[in-house]
């Protein structure tokens, strides 16, 4: 066992002495050591109960002949960090989480791991760190939140709360209605109830085979969720106690190229958050998989969009997907379009993908559509290219309700705060393309989410007549014609930084085009005169991050070959 490096032999006497101080006995030194990577934090609705989850998992690990060691990562709640400079720290926290997993697991030579994420950057951060360690790992998330209801019985969620601010600003709802939404949008613990970033990633872990079935959809704080926690604990012990299994189920043997492609395929079928693109590119790099942004459109063309979930369809939430058959039912239906839609990859459960889904079926075709009645014949995400995004940009096509072709005039803002002021003051009109720049990984730094501006646009009734492009990113709760991750970003001299108010911008989602109607001569002239804005910083960590981070087309990973 890997842990023998710290617990076997006379020269490890001091190591065992330290471990005995934590409560270990003689017999424990012959058992596998299991890391329990928790992300308990009282600030986050999806994480404040994870101390109880880890207690259940550790109890089950002990009962199955292994020794659990719990440690914790940090966590940032994107909703609470939204709309102020706290959001600068959200994406960088992914790297800190990955580094902390790698550090603890390797410093103490643990044999296997159960990771307990749930929200936002914590899920991809844990996956990235676990890939560096490459021991058998099962991810078991806290679980999704219940949807809320207003006093009149309308289903709501966090996206409703953000959009309600714009409606209140526009005079469309009263302060009493705003308060009703505030008090009922998030009624329980769990990851926010729609197909936002957290639940998108928790779902994709099922698709990749690194989490057990139900991980993305079984509600938090329910007896069914506890069953899942205990199943995961028993399974990791089965693997850790067997030498051949410890080798067979190393994380990189599960999370390989086929797993990445399966994840993107399920992402397309379910219309996941655009943040999944950023995170899956980063995960691919850690897995040693050669997968690039340009490969995503090829998958999208082969996968039908068969499940719409909030924010794309405000009445449907993760609990509804669970009742309709869950992720396995979606995956089973996907295979009816072609035998090669999903690769029959090994999963951490011991079954292959096709074995795992063989008995799954759709229980409610109003929630999960059949392959013969899709929302769209192509997937719910697209990558756009053109002179405005030479290295690509991302749009969640599942969130578009109006035309998929848009031409409008630019209204430019150097940062999210300036954009929010401009939108609220009425500077943005129908027919405009809102340009928010210097919010990329380097420019922010930290690549803020633009949920506040997009929610204001939707809430003020401009959602079908205004588009938004940014080198920043979007919350999974964003909907509408919102294009993010524009690369190269403004801070590295990208075309988005050269735009001026009044420039004509053309968007054609079905042709994968994002361009500005300028001559080559005009573009060359602007480039010659251009000096990117560099924002002042008073944060040591963000300064380090800005110096090391790559752009969104590479997953915003940190450079390591300095």
Curated annotation (Swiss-Prot):
Keywords for the protein's UniProt record, in alphabetical order: 2Fe-2S, Amino-acid biosynthesis, Branched-chain amino acid biosynthesis, Iron, Iron-sulfur, Lyase, Magnesium, Metal-binding
Top-level class of the enzyme under EC nomenclature: lyase
Keyword Ligase listed: no
Catalytic activity: (2R)-2,3-dihydroxy-3-methylbutanoate = 3-methyl-2-oxobutanoate + H2O; (2R,3R)-2,3-dihydroxy-3-methylpentanoate = (S)-3-methyl-2-oxopentanoate + H2O
GO cellular component: cytosol
Pathway membership, UniProt: Amino-acid biosynthesis; L-isoleucine biosynthesis; L-isoleucine from 2-oxobutanoate: step 3/4; Amino-acid biosynthesis; L-valine biosynthesis; L-valine from pyruvate: step 3/4
Known role: Functions in the biosynthesis of branched-chain amino acids. Catalyzes the dehydration of (2R,3R)-2,3-dihydroxy-3-methylpentanoate (2,3-dihydroxy-3-methylvalerate) into 2-oxo-3-methylpentanoate (2-oxo-3-methylvalerate) and of (2R)-2,3-dihydroxy-3-methylbutanoate (2,3-dihydroxyisovalerate) into 2-oxo-3-methylbutanoate (2-oxoisovalerate), the penultimate precursor to L-isoleucine and L-valine, respectively.
NCBIfam families in UniProt: ilvD, PRK00911.1
Name of this chain's protein: Dihydroxy-acid dehydratase
Gene source species: Aliarcobacter butzleri (strain RM4018) (Arcobacter butzleri)
């Amino acid at each position: 066992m890997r842990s023998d490096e710290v617990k076997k032999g006379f020269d490890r006497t001091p190591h065992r002495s330290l471990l005995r101080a934590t409560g270990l006995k003689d017999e424990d030194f012959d058992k596998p050591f299991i890391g329990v990577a928790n992300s308990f934090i009282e600030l986050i609705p999806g994480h404040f109960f994870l101390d109880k989850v880890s207690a259940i998992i550790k109890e089950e690990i002990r009962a199955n002949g292994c020794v659990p060691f719990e440690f914790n990562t940090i966590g940032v709640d994107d909703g609470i960090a939204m709309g102020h400079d706290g959001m600068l720290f959200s994406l960088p926290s992914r790297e800190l989480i990955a580094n902390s997993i790698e550090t603890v697991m390797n410093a103490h030579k643990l044999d296997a791991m159960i990771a307990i994420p749930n929200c936002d950057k914590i899920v991809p951060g844990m996956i990235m760190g676990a890939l560096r360690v490459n021991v058998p790992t099962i991810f078991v998330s806290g679980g999704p939140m219940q949807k809320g209801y207003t006093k009149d019985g309308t289903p709501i969620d966090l996206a409703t709360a953000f959009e309600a601010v714009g409606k209140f600003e526009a005079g469309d709802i009263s302060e009493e209605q705003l308060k009703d939404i505030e008090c009922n949008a998030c009624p329980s613990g769990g990851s926010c109830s729609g197909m936002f970033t957290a639940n998108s990633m928790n779902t994709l872990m099922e698709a990749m085979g690194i989490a057990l079935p139900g991980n993305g959809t079984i509600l938090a704080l329910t007896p069914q969720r506890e069953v899942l926690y205990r199943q995961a604990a028993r399974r990791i012990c089965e693997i850790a106690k067997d030498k051949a299994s410890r080798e067979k189920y190393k994380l990189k043997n599960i999370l390989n190229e086929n797993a990445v492609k399966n994840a993107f395929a399920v992402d397309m079928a379910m219309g996941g958050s655009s943040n999944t693109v950023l995170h899956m590119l980063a995960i691919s790099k850690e897995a040693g998989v050669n997968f690039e942004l340009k490969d995503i459109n090829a998958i999208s063309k082969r996968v039908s969009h068969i499940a719409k979930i909030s924010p794309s369809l405000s009445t449907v939430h993760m609990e509804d997907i669970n009742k309709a058959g869950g992720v396995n039912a979606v995956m089973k239906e996907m295979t009816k379009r072609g035998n090669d839609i999903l690769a029959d990859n090994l999963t951490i459960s011991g079954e292959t993908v096709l074995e795992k889904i063989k008995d799954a079926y759709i229980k409610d075709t109003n929630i999960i559509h059949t392959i013969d009645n899709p929302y769209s014949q192509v997937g719910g995400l697209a990558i756009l290219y053109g002179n405005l995004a030479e290295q690509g940009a991302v749009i969640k096509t599942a969130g578009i309700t109006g035309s998929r072709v848009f031409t409008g005039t630019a209204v430019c803002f150097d940062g999210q705060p300036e954009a929010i002021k401009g939108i609220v003051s009425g500077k943005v009109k129908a027919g405009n393309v809102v340009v928010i720049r210097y919010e990329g990984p380097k420019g922010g730094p930290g690549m803020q989410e633009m949920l506040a501006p997009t929610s204001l646009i939707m809430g003020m009734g401009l959602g079908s007549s205004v588009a938004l492009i940014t080198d920043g990113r979007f919350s999974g709760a964003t909907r509408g014609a919102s294009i993010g991750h524009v690369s190269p970003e403004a801070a590295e001299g990208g075309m988005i930084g050269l735009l001026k108010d009044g420039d004509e911008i053309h968007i054609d989602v079905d042709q994968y085009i994002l361009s500005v109607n300028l001559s080559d001569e005009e573009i060359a002239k602007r480039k010659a005169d251009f000096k990117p804005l560099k924002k002042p910083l008073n944060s040591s960590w963000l300064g380090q991050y800005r110096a090391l981070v790559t752009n969104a087309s590479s997953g915003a990973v940190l450079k390591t070959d300095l």
